[in-house]
Amino acid sequence: NLRRIGGFTDIPFLPIMGMDEPWRYRNKAQFPFGRNKNGEIVTGFYAGRTHDIIPQEDCLLGVEENKKILESIKEYMIENHVAPYEEETHQGLIRHALIRKGFKTGELMVCVIINGKKLPRSEKLVEKLCRFDGMTSISYSINTDKTNVILGKELVNLYGPGYITDYIGDVKYRISPLSFYQVNPVQTEKLYGTALEYAGLTGGEVVWDLYCGIGTISLFLAQKAKKVYGVEIVPQAIDDARENAKLNGLDNVEFFVGKAEEVLPEQYEKNKVYADVIVVDPPRKGCDEQCLNTIVTMAPKRVVYVSCDSATLARDLKMLCEKGYEVEKVRCCDMFGWTTHVETVCLLSKLHEAKHHVNVTLDMDEMDLTAAERR
């Protein structure tokens, strides 16, 4: 895609960051519930391009606890006559189960998504789930809409603080059911370490982190930068980001709620903020054009682009390179073993800052200065 869409023919690719252990690497899984042809409660995964559930209580990409947690939820449903959700009729209660685990802390989270306002006899579910070592947070999410979106807007906490914690490197993060947090923490540490390396921080820089989520990259950067500003559209993610900054004793980070393409121009035009480095980690649709234009206007020395979609990455790199930047290096990270998807991190530098540029030398003796003076 970088060649086909971006027109790049000579990109300096570095070796792919592969996975040492491509099994049991996912810290998050979401399982739909339903019934089979015999009317029995089943959970598993959707068949490709359908919403037909293939019964499967374990997956070698997920954590080992998933299987027994799902068995416990099914037991609770059967014993307490709680029906699974039926998409065709919009009847039934249990839609999905979300399970997360902190790889370094061992903390477990279970969030059950329901088609209703209340989970009956919820204490029975809590009792079953609390048998698992590391169970830290149990909640349910209310989602009564006819939608493919899994989580609802309202969360009800049943047990624990409503979140779990985990570490990437030596940075601690608070993770709620709604938090965006990379699903492969081992590879994430490699990815963010590379982004930090590309940022080239010496301690005196001002950095903007766009699409910052719960501050995962922001807090990595804050350890090496003078000041970091993070921007994220999801208010709860920013709440988590601010808590994460406090959790790590970092007071040189400031977070804004809003669209990157609106917050960045506003801060630049009204408050005259500047940036030595800008880091972007957008969703699959890539960066908004107005956001890219503001980046170009602010003219940071370096732009670090973290991407989960090579097509939109190619489009955005092409635009930045047409407006004064050059791709210095690109490196892919195998974040999703046994799939065709990778994360990519790119370093762009201002042309006059780039290592590769063209020098033009003019011989003053050969120039017609007389003509220039007459003008």
Model-identified regions with their sequence ranges:
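Rossmann-like S-adenosyl-L-methionine
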Residues: 121-132, 136-375
